[in-house]
């Protein structure tokens, strides 16, 4: 059955307008993006098939062009549209944390750091630099590693902090395995960084580890 023949309150577009985007399933949101189905398959059915094929919405959105375009009902035009949507989402989050803004929402910081690091195939260590009123100065990616480790050097972190005259920092790194639980090495290097920055009177407000689920906060664990 075509979606236009469904009851109005069950159609994805109308449902979004009436109840908001959060009320829609992954398949319904994807169907709105797809707009149309293929022969013998409406947009909702196509969306469900794609989610089953890729395993998750995140896997579909993160697919490389060749893999994406091999899927039934998708092609280069849809890939371009999708990349544009994803980039707009990243820029929205970046604007929310643009230079000069105070950090008033811990959840926004989590979302921003997730967007920057979660799907990286290799480990990346980065930090948010803040002034003495906790306004954002800069987001810096500092160290890049292998699939399971990145070498981190406290001296280079200190140099970066001094260069930008930061008064506080938020550290972050990803675990490409998807498991966000901090390792013993993560805790050890964080202690070394805190000790180094304490010598120049700069505070480490938090250290987030990014994985598949919610980021793990060192501050919430009482480790800072």
Swiss-Prot record:
Residues 102-224 form the MPN domain. Zn(2+) binds at residues 173, 175, 186. Disulfide bonds: none annotated. A motif (JAMM motif) lies at residues 173-186. Signal peptide: none annotated. GO terms for molecular function: metal ion binding; metallopeptidase activity. InterPro entries: MPN, RadC_JAB, RuvA_2-like, UPF0758, UPF0758_CS, UPF0758_N. GO terms for biological process: proteolysis. Pfam families: RadC, UPF0758_N. Keywords: Hydrolase, Metal-binding, Metalloprotease, Protease, Zinc. CDD domains: MPN_DUF2466. PANTHER family: DNA REPAIR PROTEIN RADC, UPF0758 PROTEIN YEES-RELATED. Belongs to the UPF0758 family. This is UPF0758 protein Tola_0183. It comes from Tolumonas auensis (strain DSM 9187 / NBRC 110442 / TA 4).
